[in-house]
């Protein structure tokens, strides 16, 4: 690894994903389904693909394999150039995900006058609450909800059958992508890195969830807001400076065009946020 690449890796904020928590309001059947699903893997993949964080595994099976390699490294059969004990990195924040609601199933109705024929439609939906926990202070750095769903069109089937796994996978991938995007926006806000006329270049690429035609509000960052009673930093006094629309999404940067606001008043360091819906 080159010096610059190593420096980039060291500088990345380290996170891990905690074991999934499922609300008691989720039925036993759906609880089993979501716990056995690929949701955690999808979340980890989405975070890693975003390139903003160094993702540390805390999954028991992966840690067991790492421990096995560490034991082998002490056997005298290896060059002892890796798998050192006591060198695993600590996460600066843990991502705690709680599934508040989850549904996956198939609706079916008989087709009149056709024996054994059913109109079927598959659907999957998930609602999660996410907390970003600081591992040093034990504080909640950020919290946000995530929702996603997927459904099939109606088709005619010979019998009711079972819902398509592809519909579930699609909903979980969407949820994971939404989570990773909001995580990045919380820890590392979308920031203008260059401005020329009405064009803005920001530090997000084609794996950030930004889409051509999507609209963002542009803010000018102000002074930090400090709670006089607790000393806590409550963020900055942001002032709305304009509105911009995505015109091109590149691998590592996205270009937007200002649709509202004065171009001369917007520059490097300004922050973009999605409109609150």
Where are these regions (language model features)?
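Short, compositionally biased
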Residues: 227-252
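C-terminal/domain-edge helix-coil "capping" segments
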Residues: 2-13, 123, 133-201, 208-212, ...
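Amphipathic beta-strand/beta-sheet edge segments enriched in Tyr/Trp
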Residues: 93-152
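Short hydrophobic alpha-helix segments
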Residues: 59, 144-146, 237, 244
């Amino acid at each position: 690894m080159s010096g610059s690449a190593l420096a980039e890796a060291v500088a990345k904020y380290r996170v891990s994903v905690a074991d999934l928590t499922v609300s008691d309001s989720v039925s036993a059947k759906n609880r089993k389904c979501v716990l056995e699903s690929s949701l955690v893997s999808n979340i980890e993949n989405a975070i890693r693909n975003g390139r903003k964080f160094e993702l540390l595994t805390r999954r028991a099976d992966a840690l067991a394999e790492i421990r096995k390699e560490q034991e082998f490294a002490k056997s005298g059969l290896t060059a002892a150039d890796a798998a050192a004990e006591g060198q695993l990195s600590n996460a600066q924040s843990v991502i705690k995900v709680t599934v508040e609601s989850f549904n996956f199933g198939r609706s079916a109705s008989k087709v009149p006058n056709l024996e054994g024929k059913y109109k079927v439609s598959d659907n999957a939906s998930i609602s999660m609450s996410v907390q970003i926990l600081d591992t040093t202070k034990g504080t909640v750095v950020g919290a946000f909800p995530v929702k996603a769903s997927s459904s099939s069109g109606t088709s005619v089937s010979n019998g009711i059958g079972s819902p398509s796994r592809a519909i579930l996978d699609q909903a979980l991938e969407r949820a994971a992508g939404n989570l990773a995007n909001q995580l990045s926006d919380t820890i590392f806000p979308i920031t203008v890195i260059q401005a020329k006329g009405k064009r803005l270049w920001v530090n997000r690429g084609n794996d950030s969830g930004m889409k051509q035609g999507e609209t963002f509000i542009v803010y000018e960052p102000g002074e930090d807001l400090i709670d006089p009673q607790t000393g806590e930093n409550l963020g900055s006094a942001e002032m709305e400076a304009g509105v911009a629309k995505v015109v091109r999404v590149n691998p590592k940067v996205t270009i937007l065009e200002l649709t509202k606001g004065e171009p001369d008043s917007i520059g490097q360091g300004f922050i973009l946020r999605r409109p609150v819906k």
